[in-house]
């Protein structure tokens, strides 16, 4: 075997360290967080740098196919963590479709017992498939590669007697990757918000409860101080979301406000240092969610979103509901109506709870 000549060996020992010092650093794999446009509901997809995937909620039942299509477009074949922030139909109604298409590693659930058919079907399916099931509370933390997922709420002792105990039992997540963080509070209202002594600053805030005034106040907005705030809602929804007070609070805290009804699906990408985003609709100079909340016209996107309105009928009781109603029938007992008149003509009467 030939040995290295002394001169060449000495030269190599000098040059190699210099090459290593000046070699460009390998780019870190990105973390992506997608707030999907699912109408008046929530669904957030998280693609971790290590290749694992998390889905937080899946919108209402009609949104299920939309979520499935998006996940397939991203090449998802398995969901490692499926989070049901709380049991309302506009957050977990689409989960049944997800469970029927993708294998799921584990489910995180708020643990709040709502008693609706939607929740019963959800829990029954998890049990039948033998999926690992947990109810993480404040203080729980999970490392996913180089990213960290923290649970900030709900507290170990459930809240009761609030305006909405279900909303105030939402799993509140904070996902951190390097210097960039995302706060996902479900439908948290003021009761649950008060259980967190100090809210951490976060780069991106998925606004609580579709922009309702009970989900965000000025003190909370300033504490979190997000660069971006995304509101998931449908144009023309019966609740008036997002409320003007919420938009004002977010803007006062310096956030750029985006909305799924007008900006479409919003995708954030970060390497842990910088962050960028894209939307499925052309962004306007003034954030569209803010324009709608102040009564300004939002153009064609606003009228297009109203086409997503539909109603769900109960085949047995002949009662029809809004998709977000808490008393929806089981999936096998549902019939979909595109308009209210269609339901009435077919002999269905409106639900007294949701007043469709």
Model features per residue range: what roles?
Residues 2-3, 7, 22-305, 327, ...:
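Non-globular, low-confidence helical/coil segments that flank catalytic cores
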Residues 12-14, 318, 344-347:
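Residue-level signal for mature regions of secreted extracellular proteins and peptides
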Residues 50, 316-317, 342:
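Residue-level recognition of short loop/turn positions
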Residues 117, 320, 337-338:
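A broad, structural micro-motif
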Residues 307, 314, 343:
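Immediate flanking context of iron-sulfur cluster ligation sites
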Residues 311-330:
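Short aromatic-glycine-(Arg/Gly/Cys) micro-motifs in beta-strand/loop hairpins
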Residues 326, 330-356:
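Compact, charge-rich alpha-helical regulatory domains located at protein termini
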């Amino acid at each position: 075997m030939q040995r290295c000549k002394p001169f060449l060996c000495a030269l190599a020992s000098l040059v190699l360290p210099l090459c290593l010092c000046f070699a460009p650093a390998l780019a870190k794999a990105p973390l992506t967080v997608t707030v999907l446009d699912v109408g008046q509901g929530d669904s957030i997809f998280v693609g971790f740098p290590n290749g694992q995937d998390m889905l937080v909620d899946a919108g209402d039942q009609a949104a299920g196919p939309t979520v499935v299509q998006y996940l397939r477009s991203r090449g998802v074949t398995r969901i490692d963590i499926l989070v049901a922030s709380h049991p309302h139909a506009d957050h977990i109604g689409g989960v049944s479709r997800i469970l029927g298409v993708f294998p799921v590693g584990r489910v995180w659930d708020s643990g709040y017992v709502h008693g609706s058919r939607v929740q019963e079907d959800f829990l029954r399916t998890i049990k039948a498939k033998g999926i690992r099931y947990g109810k993480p509370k404040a203080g729980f933390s999970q490392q996913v590669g180089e990213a960290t997922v923290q649970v900030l709420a709900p507290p170990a002792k459930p809240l009761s007697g609030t305006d909405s105990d279900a909303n105030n039992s939402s799993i509140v997540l904070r996902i951190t990757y390097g210097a960039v963080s995302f706060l996902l509070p479900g439908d948290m209202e003021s009761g649950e918000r008060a259980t967190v002594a100090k809210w951490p600053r976060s780069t991106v805030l998925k606004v609580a409860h579709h922009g309702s005034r009970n989900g965000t106040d000025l003190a909370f907005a300033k504490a979190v101080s997000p660069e971006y705030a995304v509101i998931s809602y449908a144009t023309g929804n019966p609740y008036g979301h997002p409320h003007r007070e919420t938009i004002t609070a977010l803007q006062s805290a310096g956030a750029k406000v985006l909305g799924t009804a007008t900006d479409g699906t919003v995708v954030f990408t970060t390497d842990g240092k910088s962050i960028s985003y894209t939307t499925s609709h052309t962004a306007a100079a003034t954030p569209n969610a803010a324009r709608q909340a102040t009564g300004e016209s939002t153009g064609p996107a606003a009228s297009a979103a109203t086409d997503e309105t539909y109603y769900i009928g109960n085949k047995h009781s002949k009662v029809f509901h809004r998709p977000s109603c808490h008393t929806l029938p089981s999936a096998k007992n549902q019939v979909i109506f595109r308009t209210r008149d269609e339901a009435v003509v077919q002999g269905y009467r409106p639900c007294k709870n949701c007043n469709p």
